[in-house]
Amino acid sequence: MIVTYNWLKEFVECDLSTQELGDLLTMLGLEVEGVREVGGGLDQVVVAVVEERRKHPNADKLSLCKVNNGREILDIVCGAQNFTAGDKVALAQIGAVLPGDFKIKRSKIRGEESCGMLCSERELGLSAESEGIMILPSDLPLGVPLFDALGLKDTIFEIGLTPNRADCLSVIGVAREIAAKLGKRITYPGHAVVESGEPVTQKATVIVEDPELCPRYTARFISGCSIGPSPAWLVRRLEAVGMRSINNVVDVTNYVLMEYGHPLHAFDADLLENSTIVVRRATDGEVFTTLDGQQRTLTAGDLTIRDGARSVALAGIMGGENSEIRDTTTNILLESAYFNPSAIRRTAKRLGLHTESSHRFERGADVAIVTRALDRAAALLAELAGGTVAAGIIDVYPTPVSHRTIRFRVDRCNALLGVELSANEMKALFHHLEFTTVTVEPGIIDVTVPTFRVDLEREIDLVEEVARLNGYDRIETTMPRARVFSDRPTKHQRMERRCRDLMVGQGFNEVITFSFMAPGALDRMMLGPEDGRRSVVALRNPLVDEQAVMRTTLLPGLLEAASRNLNYRSLDLRLFELRRVYLRVEGEQLPNEPLVLAGLMTGRRYPEGWNQEKHPLDFYDVKGVVEAVLDAFSVSGASYSSDDTDVFYHPGKSCTVKCGDLILGSLGELHPDVQDNFGIDQPVFYFELNFERLLSAARAASAVVPPSRFPDTFRDIAILVADETPAADIVRCIDGLRIREIESAAVFDLYKGVHVPEGKKSIAVRVRYRSTEKTLSDDEVSPLHQKVVDSLVAKLGATIR
């Protein structure tokens, strides 16, 4: 934000030096990033008069001039053609240093001596462009420094504002802060509007179809305007704050924008169909040409200003080429409105169109100042463009905004800041900020915040206001009063750390992905319309469309991370993430947020090495990782059942992980189409476990059992079972016998083919026996083994081979 000292002084009485004012603003939280003096160091540029002008003898385009500076008459060579003898001009005398470090010296130009230079506005830093030298008013005294004579000496402050301080995006806003700090009252500009003629309602009609995005829309009608250049004072004031003069009408809207901080827009009323304004959302795919001549494609979420037939402006951002102010414009419809900040931000960001107007609406304009800014601009247009303001004002304001009231505790504020201010002292500070207060009871105040302070919502915000206005430098340094507790992790945190250590120990790298995802990510996962993970929590104002909803699964984030790494030629990946997902609960305001452990594997089983075979990962590798996790948390009795519920897995190459009736998660190879959708062209294996359920299924640590001192013995069984019988059912059947001497049972061979009937498979199981009391003999093992065989035959329909 750029402000000038002279402009600030119009609203607040202030005699601080430039340095003092800069320090004051910075201590108020308005950081001064730069200070520039206008006219500083230009005391050698004075008012002079051209006594004589004649042609240069050696150059057709140069003139020899006799110039009187009030003390002496100097010879000056000048190339400008826009002056005559008798004109008062700006003379840069010998020794003057102009902007750009241009030093004026005595010189000879085409053989003639020149003892100075007649200056243009551009050469003095008063304008970006100029034609010829400055011609000054005839009543200015000779020899007086130019910037003193014209009152142009000024100081420009460049202020870096934080996004929450929308109220300071104006000269009045900054002046209000200065007045509050100095304990003075701000003087607002007068804006008495002289109205005449027909009422405005007979000149124009305004319809707001979307009051949610446009809570307030006001307008005035000014007829008989004459478009032309703005007066010098207005041009210079705009240029001082970095704005280019266009014409008197546009300059007035820009002037009020910088003065009040509220954007306005002027339409050529004769170009509006039926003199009608309709505020509504754009048609999806609509093409609209803005003032900069660019064609922009709109969406149904963009708010537009339309006339009776077409869009004429992008609400709060930029006007349209089809209704702009032209040299022939005579009748003007002047708009002053309040638009929803989120809607303006989304449209401006999507279109890549950032303007002074959108900058202010995005941060939150003042809905209460709409008519004041409108009247100020209308009064200036009547004065500077000769317009006639129609009687009345159109004000569409269906639901007036109420002032926010915040409960404030004096003791709490003192405790937080380490100060000792009384309630009356704090109330005085609030009154300086134009807040109103009501004492509810001793030490408790209800503070009503004006609408221009959209950033104040909670008690702590008011505490900050007290700190700012009372002075950060008045807060004494004290030791914090706090009880120190040891930072012991909770049991849940210890389990999370243990899980991460386990995954790293298995060769995985932890990744942290965004908690948001694109809605299209679920389509790329091929989830069906009835899948609960499609019921997402949407963000009201996402930063980007790719992060518009909260994630319901960790898979998209891991796949995108894998895709990026594969593009970098990291072909062997093991990634995991232990984070929350967000599942919408019907009838609940907040989603369920379970903690989920997910892992992704792709590439080779072992790192590249001279002694390692290049075995690719397969289903059993990812299953082994899940088994290791379950073992680490002492989850016993886990089962793996084939299940094609999750369509993002390869059919027949996935399973559901259960502990009893509790579903812990799933694992398997991803569907090739899902891999393609994420730009991956090699097999990917994935698992996902609900960490909360995993912990609930975990057993308490069991007592240490010393290993047996006696040798083991084993027996192998080869059986035929149905093709769909999981091998895990065989092991589970043996474990279910609860025979104390059975140490372990494991499948070591699987065979299908010759001598095995269709629909059957041959599985070999090794059962290991051991006693903790003695060495088992064959006679003791045989009956135990027979029980195993009988159980397999009875429960699984197995045939012994």
From Swiss-Prot:
CDD domains: PheRS_beta_core, tRNA_bind_bactPheRS. Residues 401-477 form the B5 domain. It is an enzyme of class 6 (ligase). Binds 2 magnesium ions per tetramer. Keywords: Aminoacyl-tRNA synthetase, ATP-binding, Cytoplasm, Ligase, Magnesium, Metal-binding, Nucleotide-binding, Protein biosynthesis, RNA-binding, tRNA-binding. PANTHER family: PHENYLALANINE--TRNA LIGASE BETA SUBUNIT (PTHR10947:SF0), PHENYLALANYL-TRNA SYNTHETASE BETA CHAIN AND LEUCINE-RICH REPEAT-CONTAINING PROTEIN 47 (PTHR10947). Tetramer of two alpha and two beta subunits. Belongs to the phenylalanyl-tRNA synthetase beta subunit family. Type 1 subfamily. This is Phenylalanine--tRNA ligase beta subunit. The gene is pheT.
